[in-house]
């Protein structure tokens, strides 16, 4: 049986940290930025850790295969 492939969309959107946590970028930073204030755009630059256990396990499974 051939090897399973990693999920291409998940590879582009998520990174695994050294501790095994999953990092992702925040949404709403693509366009229509003139109506968003500077504080909001600055906060959208930061990446966040996926907290929800169900989502975290699903993402790990997509990345590991």
Swiss-Prot record:
UniProt region (Disordered), positions on chain: 1-65
InterPro entries in the record: Ribosomal_bL35 (IPR001706), Ribosomal_bL35-like (IPR021137), Ribosomal_bL35_CS (IPR018265), Ribosomal_bL35_sf (IPR037229)
GO cellular component, one term: cytosolic large ribosomal subunit
Biased composition (Basic and acidic residues): 48-57
Source organism superkingdom: Bacteria
Record's compositionally biased regions (Basic residues): 1-45
Keywords of the record: Ribonucleoprotein, Ribosomal protein
GO BP terms: translation
A Gene Ontology molecular function term of the record: structural constituent of ribosome
Similarity-based family: Belongs to the bacterial ribosomal protein bL35 family.
Protein name: Large ribosomal subunit protein bL35
Organism: Salinibacter ruber (strain DSM 13855 / M31)
Taxonomic lineage of the native organism: Bacteria, Pseudomonadati, Rhodothermota, Rhodothermia, Rhodothermales
């Amino acid at each position: 049986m051939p090897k399973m492939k990693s999920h291409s969309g998940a590879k582009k959107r998520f990174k695994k940290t050294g501790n095994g946590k999953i990092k992702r970028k925040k949404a709403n930073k693509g366009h229509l930025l003139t109506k968003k204030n500077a504080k909001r755009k600055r906060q959208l630059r930061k990446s966040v850790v996926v907290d929800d256990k169900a989502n975290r396990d699903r993402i790990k499974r997509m990345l590991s295969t």
